[in-house]
Structures are given as C-alpha cells and as structure tokens.
Amino acid sequence: MNDAGPDAPQDAPLVPRFKLPEHCALAAVREEAFANGTTPPPGVTLVDVDTHRGLAAGYEAAAVALRSHRRLSDAVDMLRRLMSRLEHRADETIYPSPWRAGYVRAVNEAVTTIERTLAAEPFDPARERRLERRVMRIEMNAP
C-alpha cells in the first residue's frame, strides 16, 4: 500500500508542457479532498491531515508557478525560491512539520515532473530567440 501522494517514478508517462498546470491543480484538489475526509480509492492509505494540506499547498504553488511563467525553467526557479523561504521560516506554529513534509514532497515531485518534461523536449534555438525578443519588446514598451 502507498500513501495518497503520488510518487513520480522514472518510468511514469511524461506530462506534456500544456498539461502541467492542470496536472498540478488536480493533484492539489485531490489532496485537499483527502484532507477533508474523502475516502481514497482502494490501495491508497491516508496520512496525517496536515500532510495532505501541505501536499495540496505544494501542488497549488506549482500550478500557480506554471501558469505565471512562460518558461518552465522560470517556474522551477520560483518553486526553489519558495522552498528556500520555507527552510528559513522555522516557526512550527505556522508551518507544522507534517505540513512542511507534505509541501516539500509536493514541490519536489512537481519540480521533478517539470524537469522531466523539459528534458524530453527538443531544444529549438529559434523558438528561444523569438521568446527572448518578444519579452524584450514587452519590457521596452512597458510604461
């Protein structure tokens, strides 16, 4: 039996780039449902409620990072910055250790999934240059 949070084995199917935000958002909804008492499917055991809430928060952070950044590498950087901030905030009354464990696990899994998607995509230097030029035009035209 495994617990409710999915483990991302290396042989797991790749999540396409356009499905990543939805993938993380659905995982967040699932974990929040488990935290609120939804019966899990057969073969899945529930863990501590705070752990499920932490998992939900981590997946939601990943979904927000993916929706707010065009480049996957920027989303990964944002998630890593969130992790370092959490490490510096050691207040157990705000972030109980089961919540922290769930959050760390969810963000690490999301980062692994994003990196696997990035590694599977062929590098297209022309596309990267177009994105850079578009971003530069947007920044130059900003008031």
PLM features per residue range, with description:
Residues M1-L14, P143:
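Actinobacteria-biased recognition of intrinsically disordered, low-complexity terminal regions
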Residues P13-N36, L55, R71-E87:
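Short amphipathic alpha-helical heptad-repeat segments
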